Amino acid sequence: MNKITKYIDALPLSDAEKSALPDTSLQAVHQALDDDHQTFAREDDSPLGSVKARLAHSWPDSLSGDQLVKDDEGRTQLHAMPKAKRSSMIPDPWRTNPVGRFWDRLRGRDVTPRYLSRLTQEERESEQKWRTVGTIRRYILLLLTLSQTVVATWYMKTILPYQGWALINPADMVGQNLWISFMQLLPYVLQSGILILFAVLFCWVSAGFWTALMGFLQLLIGRDKYSISASTVGDEPLNPAHRTALIMPICNEDVDRVFAGLRATWESVKATGNAAHFDVYILSDSYNPDICVAEQKAWMELIAEVQGEGQIFYRRRRRRVKRKSGNIDDFCRRWGSQYSYMVVLDADSVMTGECLSSLVRLMEANPNAGIIQSSPRASGMDTLYARCQQFATRVYGPLFTAGLHFWQLGESHYWGHNAIIRVKPFIEHCALAPLPGEGNFAGSILSHDFVEAALMRRAGWGVWIAYDLPGSYEELPPNLLDELKRDRRWCQGNLMNFRLFLVRGMHPVHRAVFLTGVMSYLSAPLWFMFLALSTALQVVHALTEPQYFLQPRQLFPVWPQWRPELAIALFASTMVLLFLPKLLSIILVWCKGPKEYGGFFRVTLSLLLEVLFSVLLAPVRMLFHTVFVVSAFLGWEVVWNSPQRDDDSTPWGEAFMRHGSQLLLGLVWAVGMAWLDLRFLFWLAPIVVSLILSPFVSAISSRATVGLRTKRWKLFLIPEEYSPPQVLKDTDAYLTMNRQRSLDDGFMHAVFNPSFNALATAMATARHRQGHILEIARERHVEQALNETPDKLNRDRRLVLLSDPVTMSRLHYRVWAAPEKYSSWVNAYQQLALNPLALKTK
């Protein structure tokens, strides 16, 4: 069999069609497949003429009549997106300087948006009612939190050993030995720092406690007159004039999982009978060429399997401007005006058709709602770490989400996915300008979701959490280290967002959201400083003689005092604030039926194990978050390159590499405290033991085998595992099917395989006009690539080749026409582990 017959045999044709092709040359084969009988000046451009035929034979059920068109140079192009109808989406520059804002106000340039003019009188009254209620509730929350913090801080002050602040007079220290003055002041300086940090941290814990408590009461009562879900009956027909786009921004994601979840979601939408009201947009920012080809293949298969022609679209951006938020902005500018609403999905999102339809109904029933956020439930993971986190979010999460809604009402959070957005005000008000200045906290906004919610509210639109709406799902990171990688990005984003705290027009609730976002990570170094100062105070007490006389002619000494009964009482009170939300959560589960969680005994045991697990992980997260915050402020880049692994487990070597410093710190801390005062080590035991065990906990909890064993024992069981909804069962089934036909080494297949080459050529985005300079550049790219071995061709160069239909055509032609000349490429392709199911296109 010669190279021509080998090529013909690789074509997606029937035996009769193959036998009818000429076997004289590759050019003749492509000319025979070209129904338009195009002529090309170069022989190696002839595959451009056969692209349409190769695509039509490979994916006949995926193409509609008007998708394959000719570009300006007569090359076949696959239109994977509808015709654009552009809108203007221009960001307003940020004024983060309060002095500048004050000057604008003096000159009459500080104009507050007059949003109420678009509402009817009845809508204004309803709007004003819930906003007044929300304001009153938040003042109550502030009063409760501050009162609790003041009392606890006063108790903390009485517990601390050195009580002689009032006797210290700086004037008496003039002329005194500096060392003596320093030793007199040191304990009190340490105590002052401890007291300030305690007040801040206790206030943070108190706010979480009251949020969970109100969420518990809300869920226990079961009635919420201000719940946005109560604004519809739930079976109203959707308005055909208001169409919705389901948009999924992705970037180098697990292609099999992305398209499995998307297919399950779309089929659930079709089952409701409302598919005509929705379109799907897969918005790819992927820059891994292998993944890009796999995405194109998966999109073609998805369209064929769900009959999604004209409703499921795919786009890969050539210029990745502003990451995810820029991807969404690009969609809004090009196609947003064609839709009333859009639902943003993450790569791991799965939503039922009924949930999506309900979100649309809520938008139509609440004309002043700008964003409605569903409450995603975590499911689908098997590692011990992920199952424990799934259980925690499933049991505790509803309390905190309902509590957030209770305090915030329509001035709430948006988490960036599984939410519906009103497109027109989003385009008008939510474009994100880069933060001004230079440095680590300038440039493109990373955590865009909080900022978009704040801008939507600033324009007068409501931002709601539909906390009681079922059918919204997501997945969690499989292990601790993957979660910390995500936290590294979120930490940087939240610290950047705090620069917007004083921006004009931001609602106080969203200023508080920026503050809580910062505190989510800043609390870690504050806690670490609190522990460090407490340790330092103990060192001072153990190694130095107390200063009993702080004033000249002082008659009575100031004795250090210890009040263990108050210390125990304060410790117990703090533990109540920390752990009572967990107890309330389990009480709610007991009241509503623990069967779906494994029964009364197992859900209680799971709770106790989760508490132990969270105690072990809290100090570990504290140290990592402290490093993240410090590195962000100092402008350090935390490089985190994990080794490739076949599953989600953390290798022992990586665990000790990441946690080795924590283990060492825990050992030194424990030994030092045991030497100084064994009693103080008792109080530090939860911290130091967690640090010493951190590599072991991190590695063992990442094992799916351990997680599946707990699943068999019905520990950490959640309702989605006890009785999986159909959309999750479909996701698992489609994921299994996609894994079986998964395409690896997509770029090499796009070079060699006739079907995938046709697909890559038709979907290539660099549609340049012919030009002499461009022709020289193309020839240089192709020649340099073929004269090297494929493994020396880096990712960026592969992406350049993949983006140009002409270079892909020439690569394809040359490796087939002269296999002996380009033997390094041919041998590399033949050595690949080929998946026959992945290459089966018909």
From Swiss-Prot:
<feature type="transmembrane region" description="Helical">
    <location>
        <begin position="568"/>
        <end position="588"/>
    </location>
</feature>
<dbReference type="InterPro" id="IPR050321">
    <property type="entry name" value="Glycosyltr_2/OpgH_subfam"/>
</dbReference>
<dbReference type="GO" id="GO:0016758">
    <property type="term" value="F:hexosyltransferase activity"/>
</dbReference>
<keyword id="KW-1003">Cell membrane</keyword>
<keyword id="KW-0997">Cell inner membrane</keyword>
<keyword id="KW-1133">Transmembrane helix</keyword>
<comment type="similarity">
    <text>Belongs to the glycosyltransferase 2 family. OpgH subfamily.</text>
</comment>
<dbReference type="Pfam" id="PF00535">
    <property type="entry name" value="Glycos_transf_2"/>
</dbReference>
<keyword id="KW-0808">Transferase</keyword>
<keyword id="KW-0812">Transmembrane</keyword>
<protein>
    <recommendedName>
        <fullName>Glucans biosynthesis glucosyltransferase H</fullName>
        <ecNumber>2.4.1.-</ecNumber>
    </recommendedName>
</protein>
<dbReference type="InterPro" id="IPR023725">
    <property type="entry name" value="Glucans_biosynth_gluTrFase_H"/>
</dbReference>
<feature type="transmembrane region" description="Helical">
    <location>
        <begin position="680"/>
        <end position="700"/>
    </location>
</feature>
<feature type="transmembrane region" description="Helical">
    <location>
        <begin position="656"/>
        <end position="676"/>
    </location>
</feature>
<feature type="transmembrane region" description="Helical">
    <location>
        <begin position="194"/>
        <end position="214"/>
    </location>
</feature>
<feature type="transmembrane region" description="Helical">
    <location>
        <begin position="513"/>
        <end position="533"/>
    </location>
</feature>
<comment type="function">
    <text>Involved in the biosynthesis of osmoregulated periplasmic glucans (OPGs).</text>
</comment>
<feature type="transmembrane region" description="Helical">
    <location>
        <begin position="140"/>
        <end position="160"/>
    </location>
</feature>
<comment type="pathway">
    <text>Glycan metabolism; osmoregulated periplasmic glucan (OPG) biosynthesis.</text>
</comment>
<dbReference type="GO" id="GO:0009250">
    <property type="term" value="P:glucan biosynthetic process"/>
</dbReference>
<feature type="transmembrane region" description="Helical">
    <location>
        <begin position="615"/>
        <end position="635"/>
    </location>
</feature>
<dbReference type="InterPro" id="IPR001173">
    <property type="entry name" value="Glyco_trans_2-like"/>
</dbReference>
<keyword id="KW-0472">Membrane</keyword>
<dbReference type="InterPro" id="IPR029044">
    <property type="entry name" value="Nucleotide-diphossugar_trans"/>
</dbReference>
<dbReference type="GO" id="GO:0005886">
    <property type="term" value="C:plasma membrane"/>
</dbReference>
<keyword id="KW-0328">Glycosyltransferase</keyword>
